[in-house]
């Protein structure tokens, strides 16, 4: 007895496009669940936080820019209260996990003591490993010294800890410096010290202050 093979129905070009869109939507959703949901301490409670569109877009653009060897400067502007801290945390996490970064060092630069403590609590809540707190100049020097510990991971510190450190302390290229309130922390001598001590690092500024299109704002990390 002969059975004729059944053929699958042909799929039109529009049908293929629809399947592609569905596949992309699934991939996008899975990636969102993996990369853009975090748990962090807020109002003394551990809460689930979902990054908003402006945050996810900023994270992706900063990571892509930081991994481009031709572009070592950048600036992210979030309006006050729009989640700049969590954008920084997720950027640090994805940079640290990126294979292209080759076991990097990521500096989270905070400008006030109370924000430094909050950043450490949030990093602990997110569950990130390889987090160090450089609360003293000597500790920062030890962590960064290319001839010494040459720490690979995330370092939370404040920019004034960079005073009195030697030039060319670490010349690796896979050092990423994420600077909170860059408009007021990178101007003057402290900013010069920072860039002299890490001459090949990538510097990404984060600010809640609008940037003038012509002057770029005094003390900010400029696009480059």
Model-derived regions, located:
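Signature of the SF2 helicase/ATPase Hel1-core->accessory helical subdomain module
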Residues: 1, 171-224
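ATP-dependent helicase/translocase motor core
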Residues: 1-105, 110, 114-130, 153-154, ...
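Flexible loop/turn segments at secondary-structure boundaries
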Residues: 82-86, 114-118, 163-165, 184-187, ...
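Conserved catalytic network of the ASCE P-loop NTPase/AAA+ motor domain
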Residues: 98-101, 147-149, 168-171, 195-200
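Flexible phosphate/Mg2+-sensing switch loops adjacent to catalytic phosphate-binding sites
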Residues: 99-104, 131-134, 215-224
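Conserved helicase motor
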Residues: 113, 134-143, 158-164
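Conserved motor-coupling elements within RecA-like helicase/translocase cores
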Residues: 138-155, 168-169
């Amino acid at each position: 007895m002969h059975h004729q093979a059944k053929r699958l129905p042909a799929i039109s070009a529009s049908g293929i496009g629809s399947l592609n869109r569905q596949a992309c939507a699934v991939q996008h959703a899975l990636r969102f669940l993996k990369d853009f949901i975090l748990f962090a301490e807020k109002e003394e409670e551990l809460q689930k936080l979902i990054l908003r569109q402006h945050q996810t877009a900023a994270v992706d653009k900063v990571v892509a820019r930081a991994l481009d060897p031709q572009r070592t400067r950048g600036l992210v502007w979030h309006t006050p209260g729009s989640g700049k801290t969590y954008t920084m945390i997720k950027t640090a996490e994805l940079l640290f996990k990126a294979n292209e970064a080759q076991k990097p060092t990521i500096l989270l630069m905070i400008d006030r003591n109370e924000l430094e403590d909050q950043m450490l609590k949030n990093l602990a809540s997110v569950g990130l490993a390889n987090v160090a707190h450089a609360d003293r100049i000597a500790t920062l020097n030890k962590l960064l010294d290319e001839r010494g510990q040459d720490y690979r991971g995330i370092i939370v510190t404040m920019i004034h800890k960079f005073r009195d450190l030697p030039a060319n302390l670490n010349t690796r290229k896979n050092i990423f410096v994420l600077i909170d309130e860059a408009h007021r922390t990178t101007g003057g001598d402290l900013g010069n010290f920072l860039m002299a001590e890490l001459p090949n690092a990538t510097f990404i500024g984060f600010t809640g202050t609008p940037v003038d299109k012509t002057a770029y704002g005094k003390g900010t990390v400029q696009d480059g």
